[in-house]
Structures are given as structure tokens and as C-alpha cells.
A protein has these predicted regions:
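Von Willebrand factor
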Residues: 1-26, 53-54, 72-76, 106-109
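Hydrophobic pocket-lining residues that define ligand/cofactor binding sites across diverse proteins
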Residues: 2, 61-64
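Loop/turn elements at helix/coil->beta-strand transitions in domains of secreted/extracellular proteins
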Residues: 5-10, 66-71, 96-102, 121-124
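Mature, Sec-exported extracytoplasmic domains of Gram-positive
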Residues: 7-8, 20, 31-37, 50-51, ...
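Exposed, interaction-prone extracellular/peripheral surfaces
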Residues: 16-18, 28-45, 52, 63-66
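Generic alpha-helical hydrophobic packing signal
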Residues: 21-25, 32, 36, 91-96
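VWA/integrin I-like adhesion module and closely mimicked acidic/polar interface patches used
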Residues: 41-48, 55, 79-131, 135-139
Length: 143
């Protein structure tokens, strides 16, 4: 799943029509294993509001000294977002940090929305429709 450094922080924000409970793992030990279990137990369902999830990610980043990390948001999405790109863009500008928002698309993801988000945040879109694990590894290597 993930291979993290001892200083790395991974924050999981599952979402459908809205963001769900935030899960955090620091380092590469038991917390990361627990995060992996949480991911494995997730089941897709409901709507898709990737912008709200990305906004929550920006809010979470405010809790860290970003100069000590290489921050990035990685969205895994299988649908078309029902949320507002403009609301995300406003919050992104307010944060004042250049945090790339990478996307991994699978299922019926809307590539146009993902490309717009990637272009705005200086990131990329990865295609996970064939191999989600490889797409995720590509994102981690890119950041």
C-alpha cells in the first residue's frame, strides 16, 4: 500500500456527497497499517463532492508547518463532482501555499474536472482505471 518515511504524515479523508471522518497516520508503523485497514474497509457509495474533500484537506494542512513537509492532496474519485470549483479555488488562494492536488481517476470520473483542478494547482491527473495501485505509486513518486 504505502511506503512512508518516519517523518511523513498521511491524512485520509474519505468522501462521497460530503467528506467523512478524517484519519491520520504519522510515520511508517502501526498508524500506517491502521490507515491501510481503513482504506480497505471503505465501500463506494453516494454522491461525489471532491471539491469539499479537497477543501477539508486544505483545512487539515493548516495544522502543520508546511515548510517542514512536501504537502500534496491526492484525490481518488470515480464520479463527477457535484461541488463548487470556485469555493475550492477561493480557499486554495486563502491558504497561500502552493499545494498540488493530484487526482487518480477510476470508474466514471470526470476527466475535465480533474484536469481543471490539476492545472489550477500545478499537479497531474493519473488514470487508475486499469491499475489503481500503480497509479497511486506514480503519484507518490511524482510528489
Amino acid at each position: 500500500f504505502l511506503q512512508a518515511s518516519s517523518r511523513e504524515v498521511n491524512i485520509l479523508i474519505p468522501f462521497s456527497g460530503e467528506p467523512m471522518e478524517v484519519c491520520t497516520a504519522q510515520g511508517n508503523g502501526a498508524e500506517l497499517e491502521a490507515l491501510n485497514t481503513t482504506v480497505q474497509d471503505l465501500a463506494p457509495g453516494g454522491g461525489t463532492d471532491m471539491y469539499a474533500a479537497a477543501l477539508r484537506g486544505l483545512e487539515e494542512l493548516k495544522n502543520y508547518d508546511l515548510s517542514q513537509y512536501t504537502p500534496a492532496i491526492i484525490l481518488l474519485t470515480d464520479g463527477q463532482s457535484e461541488g463548487s470549483f470556485r469555493a475550492f479555488a477561493d480557499a486554495y488562494e486563502e491558504l497561500g501555499a502552493q499545494v498540488p492536488v493530484f487526482s487518480i481517476m477510476f470508474g466514471d470520473a470526470d476527466e475535465t474536472q480533474l484536469e481543471e483542478l490539476a492545472q489550477y494547482t500545478n499537479a497531474r491527473v493519473f488514470d487508475g482505471r486499469e491499475n489503481l495501485t500503480e497509479a497511486f505509486r506514480s503519484v507518490k513518486g511524482y510528489n
